[in-house]
Amino acid sequence: MQLSFPAIVLAAPGAVCAQGYPFSQRQTISQNVALTTVTVSYGRPVARGRPLWGQLVPWDSVWHPGADSATRVVFDHDVTIEGHALKAGEYSLWLVPHEQRPWTVIFSRAAHVFHKPYPGSSEDVLRVDVSPESASHMETLAIEFPVVLREQAVMRVHWGSTAVPIHIGAPYRPD
């Protein structure tokens, strides 16, 4: 059987989708803070009208902010996170949302993992508590740097009407 060119062209989009077109798009964002480069790579899930906090993302459980592979954060120099030291390196980012208290932000040394299951607290390098903020609705999860000053920045995880600001300190240290 010989297929005509139009038949092949019409069949091609289905073949592309069958090979795993991602439901959540990937994003990589880099931000310089003093002499430090912070790079974040993550999948961007879409709310699609679903209730997020306490339902799609359960309260008091470790959650990966993203889709597919775990969110990776790379610091090319030592930094502080909410005032706590974190060595230069590559980490996966995890959050524990709480309904009535600050959320827990986790940096894990298990940087190259899928988003489930959580690699476990034995892989945690740093845990800090951060108070979430109400924000305008963000349909697609976003990790952004809304504040960048000379030696500090805020990395914000924003999805739905909740944003989690994570303060990064990057002291100016010329080599």
Predicted regions and their residues:
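Targeting-peptide/extracellular-domain and disordered-appendage signature
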Residues: 19-87, 92-175
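Cleavable N-terminal signal peptides
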Residues: 5-6, 16
